[in-house]
């Protein structure tokens, strides 16, 4: 099946992939379970990485159990829908408790049940410059998105919140604020990159779990970018080419911090920084754009 790269559809003012927009209504009837764990991110912020870390924690670090199915089958993607592929809600029906779930939805579109049940959330935030570069490459290879156009026009659309899932700025801020009323562990991609063991220990504490030191070391090793890029259960190469074309750009491209410097021009960087300073003026947390 060839995808025609349909335009984004706005739901409550949030632009979404056309097929994903169709799930927002049905998702409102979704029933969360108290022992669910939600992984929330803006796209291209380490969702798959965190999904694999958490599945390894849930499986006690046993590699063969984590190889039971591709990551998107082990951690259902709530709003996912695509012709010819099981939807996120369909995958959920096959998922036994305790369930790991993932979403990129902003709070305004999140199923209310997740909030009512006080489902624990692990949120990963990544610096905007690396996100937008990664997102541009992802738009090019993932054909459910509209054509991204030129890099310069995509950058403008990102700053204006006119890309799938809307404003990065609003997303990272509203989930940060949710910490005051909801059990949210807010992590930074750059911190996990810098010291994965330290961050995994934070996750274990948040979940009220413990693992032997050697198991934690094994999780660090097997969730490294190199290992995950080689692993067909995590690198999305099992998705049909007509949906994701890895010849255009691999799903797991570089996984670094600071790669934006290879894409932004000096003028684009100045424009982005000025807009960022204005948009994030009320923000009480800081991102690192290089390590």
From Swiss-Prot:
3'-phosphoadenylyl sulfate binds at residues 44-49, 126, 134, 189, 223-228, 251-255. Liver, kidney, heart and colon. It is an enzyme of class 2 (transferase). Induction: Induced by androgens and suppressed by estrogens. The expression is under the influence of pituitary growth hormone and thyroid hormone. Keywords: Cytoplasm, Lipid metabolism, Phosphoprotein, Steroid metabolism, Transferase. The keyword Phosphoprotein applies. Transmembrane segments: none annotated. Substrate binds at residues 102-104. It catalyses: a phenol + 3'-phosphoadenylyl sulfate = an aryl sulfate + adenosine 3',5'-bisphosphate + H(+); 17beta-estradiol + 3'-phosphoadenylyl sulfate = 17beta-estradiol 3-sulfate + adenosine 3',5'-bisphosphate + H(+); 4-ethylphenol + 3'-phosphoadenylyl sulfate = 4-ethylphenyl sulfate + adenosine 3',5'-bisphosphate + H(+); 4-nitrophenol + 3'-phosphoadenylyl sulfate = 4-nitrophenyl sulfate + adenosine 3',5'-bisphosphate. GO terms for biological process: 3'-phosphoadenosine 5'-phosphosulfate metabolic process; 4-nitrophenol metabolic process; catecholamine metabolic process; dopamine catabolic process; estrogen metabolic process; ethanol catabolic process; flavonoid metabolic process; regulation of blood pressure. The N-terminus is blocked. Its EC number is 2.8.2.1. InterPro entries: P-loop_NTPase, Sulfotransferase_dom. One of its GO terms (cellular component) is cytoplasm. The modification Phosphoserine is found at residue 134. Its main location: cytoplasm. Homodimer. PANTHER family: SULFOTRANSFERASE SULT. Belongs to the sulfotransferase 1 family. Sulfotransferase that utilizes 3'-phospho-5'-adenylyl sulfate (PAPS) as sulfonate donor to catalyze the sulfate conjugation of a wide variety of acceptor molecules bearing a hydroxyl or an amine group. Sulfonation increases the water solubility of most compounds, and therefore their renal excretion, but it can also result in bioactivation to form active metabolites. Displays broad substrate specificity for small phenolic compounds. Plays an important roles in the sulfonation of endogenous molecules such as steroid hormones. This is Sulfotransferase 1A1. The lineage of its organism: Eukaryota, Metazoa, Chordata, Craniata, Vertebrata.
């Amino acid at each position: 099946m060839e995808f025609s790269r349909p335009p984004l559809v706005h739901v409550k003012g949030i632009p979404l992939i056309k097929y994903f927009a169709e799930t927002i209504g049905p998702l409102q009837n979704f029933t969360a379970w108290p022992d669910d764990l939600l992984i929330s991110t803006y796209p291209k912020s380490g969702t798959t990485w965190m999904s694999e870390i958490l599945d390894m924690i849930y499986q006690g670090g046993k590699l063969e159990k984590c190889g039971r199915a591709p990551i998107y089958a082990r951690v259902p993607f709530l709003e996912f829908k695509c012709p010819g592929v099981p939807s996120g809600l369909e995958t959920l029906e096959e998922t036994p408790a305790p369930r790991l779930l993932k979403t990129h939805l902003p709070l305004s579109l999140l199923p209310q049940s997740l909030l009512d049940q006080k489902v624990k959330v692990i949120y990963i935030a990544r610096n905007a410059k690396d996100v937008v570069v990664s997102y541009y490459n992802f738009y090019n290879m993932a054909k459910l998105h509209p054509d991204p156009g030129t890099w310069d026009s995509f950058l403008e659309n990102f700053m204006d919140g006119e890309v799938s899932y809307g404003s990065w700025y609003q997303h990272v801020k509203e989930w940060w604020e949710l910490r005051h009323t909801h059990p949210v562990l807010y992590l930074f991609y750059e911190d996990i990159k810098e010291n994965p063991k330290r961050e995994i220990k934070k996750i274990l504490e948040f979940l009220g779990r413990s693992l032997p030191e050697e198991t934690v070391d094994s999780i660090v090793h097997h969730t490294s970018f190199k290992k995950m890029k080689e692993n067909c259960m995590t690198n999305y190469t099992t998705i049909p080419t007509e949906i994701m074309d890895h010849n255009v750009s691999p799903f797991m491209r570089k996984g670094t911090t600071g790669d934006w410097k290879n894409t932004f021009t000096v003028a684009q960087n100045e424009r982005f920084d000025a807009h960022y300073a204005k948009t994030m003026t009320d923000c009480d947390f800081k991102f690192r754009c290089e390590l």
